[in-house]
């Protein structure tokens, strides 16, 4: 029994010495190893975080094997802006401020007043109505509206061939030639800073509205994506029922729709 006790004591002493040596060795390990490990871990987290903000292009299998293909996939595609489903380009809008027509049959005086105001010429609707000969139950004939428009805009009622001034175009039919001419005149007037004068049937423009005859002020256009053609036409409507809480009387319509709405009224005209 004494021998066994001595053996147990020796083994215990040896175990204690081994544990002490192991503890001492761990305390003497270089701290730079720990620092390097921490630095490596931080760098990986930064890389991973940066990847979170990038679009995931790994759904394409070939992007993992071809660097050129990856760059092509990562390149953002230029998206064409659309308005009411129609691709558009630059907005070319004239500064035509909405006026509400002050009588039910004052759409022409209100339209002309807006057109004049856009050029810094202030003439009230009642003065214009009197000069135009606006009457009930019809309203204003376009020839008189444009005559008075020219008077206040340019100083004469009937411009000569070589003089600046508004001319009336009567829309008899719609075809590629008449549409192209209409669009070119819109572009030219807008570039020169002059609104246009449109007469149309609001029943063809506004859903649920009865057929009638109405005048509005053309206020420029929105170009096609290549900025070479007319995609949509701006106009400002003076009738109180056709006002938007945000945009007022400002509307857009395609040139084809606008011309189509002119056909069929008693005076299917626009002035440019």
Q: What is the predicted role of each segment?
A:
Residues 28-86:
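N-terminal, intrinsically disordered, polar/charged segments of Gram-positive cell-envelope systems
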Residues 1-14:
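N-terminal Sec-pathway targeting helices
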Residues 79-137:
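Active-site nucleophile-adjacent alpha helix/oxyanion-hole segment immediately C-terminal to the catalytic cysteine
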Residues 28-31, 76-81, 86-89, 127-272:
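Conserved active-site-adjacent core of cysteine acyl-enzyme catalytic domains
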Residues 11-23:
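Hydrophobic membrane-insertion alpha-helices, especially the h-region
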Residues 16-17, 38, 60, 66, ...:
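N-terminal compositionally biased, intrinsically disordered segments and leader/signal-like regions
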């Amino acid at each position: 029994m004494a021998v066994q006790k001595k053996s147990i004591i020796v083994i215990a002493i040896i175990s204690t010495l081994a544990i002490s040596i192991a503890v001492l060795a761990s305390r003497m390990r270089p701290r730079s190893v720990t620092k390097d490990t921490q630095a490596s871990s931080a760098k990986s987290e930064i890389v991973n975080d940066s990847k979170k903000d990038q679009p995931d292009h790994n759904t394409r299998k070939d992007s993992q094997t071809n660097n050129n293909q990856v760059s092509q996939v990562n390149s953002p595609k230029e998206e064409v802006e659309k308005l009411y489903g129609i691709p558009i380009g630059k907005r070319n809008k004239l500064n035509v401020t909405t006026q509400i027509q002050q009588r039910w049959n004052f759409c022409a005086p209100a339209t002309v007043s807006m057109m004049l105001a856009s050029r810094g010429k202030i003439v009230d609707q009642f003065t214009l109505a009197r000069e135009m000969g606006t009457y009930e139950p019809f309203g204003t004939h376009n020839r008189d509206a444009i005559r008075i428009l020219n008077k206040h805009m340019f100083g004469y009622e009937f411009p000569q061939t070589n003089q600046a001034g508004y001319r009336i175009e009567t829309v008899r039919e719609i075809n590629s030639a008449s549409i192209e001419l209409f669009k070119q005149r819109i572009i030219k007037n807008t570039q020169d800073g002059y609104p246009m004068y449109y007469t149309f049937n609001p029943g063809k423009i506004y859903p649920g509205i009865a057929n009638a005859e109405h005048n509005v002020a053309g206020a420029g256009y929105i170009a096609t994506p290549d900025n070479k053609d007319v995609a949509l036409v701006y106009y400002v409507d003076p009738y109180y029922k056709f006002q938007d809480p945000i945009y007022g009387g400002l509307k857009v319509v395609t040139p084809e729709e606008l011309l189509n709405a002119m056909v069929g009224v008693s005076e299917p005209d626009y002035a440019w």
